[in-house]
Design a protein with these regions (language model features):
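Non-catalytic terminal extensions of PLP-dependent enzymes
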Residues: 1-62, 68-69, 73-77, 332-472
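Long, structured ligand/cofactor-binding scaffold of large enzymes
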Residues: 48-92, 97-100, 105-110
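Predominant activation on well-ordered alpha-helical scaffold segments within soluble catalytic domains
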Residues: 72-80, 102-106, 128, 182-185, ...
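Short Gly/Ser/Thr- and Asp/Glu-enriched loop/turn motifs at secondary-structure junctions
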Residues: 87-88, 322-328, 360-366
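Conserved PLP-enzyme active-site core in the AAT-like
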Residues: 88, 92-268
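A short linear hydrophobic-aromatic micro-motif
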Residues: 89, 316-319, 353-358
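Alpha-helical scaffolding segments of alpha/beta enzyme cores, especially the outer helices
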Residues: 182-186, 190, 307, 342, ...
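Active-site C-terminal subdomain of aminotransferase-like
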Residues: 211, 215-327, 331-336
């Protein structure tokens, strides 16, 4: 509620601190998703101070605030120089990977006649979201069941006269493997179709590795590429870049409107008004770390991933999916007695968060880990926790009320309001608004048994209920 009289800054900050008590920790590497910690206080300070310095600057009109143009040129130029481009490579600074992908899809749509986007099943849902928003149709292709990489022959079969864009991941988020970008980009070029490389998660770690597969703008046929700086760039959240091979493609990503009596609108992104804090934070972070700093952090993250894989090899009940090219690892069960959803809850008791991933297209349920610059120091402790948790959960399954899974599957969601949905969630032990890392095995088990469309409908209702006053 809005107070009648203003509150003091100290009071407000104290309340924020109380609200954050239920959050997962953002530092020290115990949360293997969502957050990226360089473990270097001076880098965080540079990013934070620059962010605050530009907090009130509005990027809506670059002619009013030319500092935003100067900063964007510097950030885009720095990213392009590392990712196969040069000082003349066009690009756009965006709020995140989804917005970068949205612009790449829009550019492809507006420069061609196709209305289909060909993508591997492992491609990020941001592409499906872009298709949904932009009136396009996603055409998914399978990945190799062993390597989990996109299969070029399947991509070739999917490309047709209606194709607007072909997508490859570098790497795919779920399993950390890089698709065969040269082969896929060549196929797209042969058909005269743009090819986008989604390097949102890997674009700022792969370039610093000596043995990274080819994936960037230097690969013939790659016409656009997205790279998040708030991931392995370690910048404050809200920082991504989309690069284009031509000025024509970047112009097609823009939006302008003069068909009204107000000010003329020209947007480089989906957003109009936008604070310049993230842009300044990204610029400062890039310069505070420099190439040598990123090289060191990438090596440490990869060393952590290698140590994790080595340690998991000594736990017979677990296995790594695929052969990751980046410091992202997915752990699946190698023993029917070990349920990965139950395992995640057990590991959480020791203060570690592993991200559950549901089964899909023949890929088993698994636990995702993103390893960062601070992960190496704690990976042995995590392996000890994993080994102990595996021993503790053998043979255990989520405690589900009888018939609940069938009830959920047959539920008419349109006939259930948020209050009733909250009551349904409480039946499986879910308390909305509870602390991060609360038990989720029961929910994940139910979702895992449902078709993707049903999962999505339930997740929408979950989000609606989470933001409902009935959950206060």
């Amino acid at each position: 509620m809005l107070p009648e009289n203003g509150r003091s800054t100290e009071d407000l900050l104290a309340e924020l601190a109380r609200l954050k008590e239920g959050d997962l920790p953002v530092r020290e590497g115990r949360v293997a998703a969502y957050v990226y910690d360089p473990g270097r206080p001076h880098v965080r300070e540079a990013g934070h101070r620059a962010y605050l310095e530009m907090l009130e600057v509005n990027g809506l009109d670059p002619t009013a605030f030319p500092s935003t143009v100067a900063l964007e040129k510097r950030v885009v130029g720095a990213v392009a120089a590392v990712l196969g481009g040069d000082a003349s490579t066009p690009g756009v600074f965006t709020s995140g990977g989804t917005e970068s992908i949205m612009l790449a899809v829009k550019a492809a749509r507006d420069t061609g006649s196709g209305r289909e986007v060909v993508l591997p099943v492992t491609a990020h849902p941001a592409f499906r979201k872009a298709c949904h928003y932009l009136g396009l149709t996603p055409v998914t292709v399978p990945v190799d069941p062993g390597t989990l990489r996109a299969v070029p022959s399947a991509v070739a079969d999917a490309i047709g006269p209606g194709t607007a864009l072909v997508v490859a991941s570098a790497p795919s988020y779920p399993h950390g493997v890089v698709d065969p970008v040269p082969e896929i980009a060549a196929l797209a070029a042969r058909h005269g179709v743009p090819c986008h490389v989604d390097a949102c998660v890997g674009g700022w770690v792969l370039p610093w590795l000596a043995d990274a597969p080819p994936f960037d703008l230097s690969v013939p046929g790659v016409t656009s590429l997205s790279c998040d700086l708030h991931k392995y760039g370690y910048a404050p959240k809200g920082a991504s870049v989309v690069l284009f091979a031509t000025e024509e493609l970047r112009r097609a990503a823009y939006y302008a409107s003069a068909d009204w009596p107000g000010y003329t609108v020209i947007n480089s992104t989906v957003q109009s008004s936008k604070g310049a804090g993230p842009l300044a934070g990204a610029w400062a972070t890039l310069n505070a770390l420099g190439a040598s700093g990123y090289r060191e952090l990438a090596a440490e993250a990869m060393a952590a991933a290698a140590r994790l894989r080595e340690g998991v090899a000594g736990i017979p009940e677990l296995r790594v999916l695929g052969e990751p090219d980046a410091p992202l690892v997915a752990l699946a069960s190698a023993d029917p007695a070990v349920d990965v959803f139950v395992l995640a809850d057990e590991v959480a008791k020791s203060g570690w968060f592993l991200q559950a991933q549901l089964s899909y297209a023949g890929i088993p349920p698994n636990l995702h880990l993103t390893l960062t610059g601070v992960s190496l120091a704690g990976v042995d402790a995590l392996l000890e926790v994993l080994a102990g948790a595996v021993a503790a959960v053998g043979g255990l399954r989520p405690d589900l009320p009888g018939g609940l899974a069938g009830t959920v599957e047959g539920l008419d969601l349109e006939a259930v309001d948020d209050r009733a949905f909250v009551e349904l969630l409480s039946a499986v032990g879910v308390t909305l608004g509870g602390p991060g890392g609360s038990p989720t095995a029961a929910v994940n088990t139910i979702l895992d048994g449902l078709a993707p469309a049903t999962r999505e409908a339930l997740l929408v209702r979950f989000l609606s209920a989470l933001n409902s006053p009935h959950t206060d």
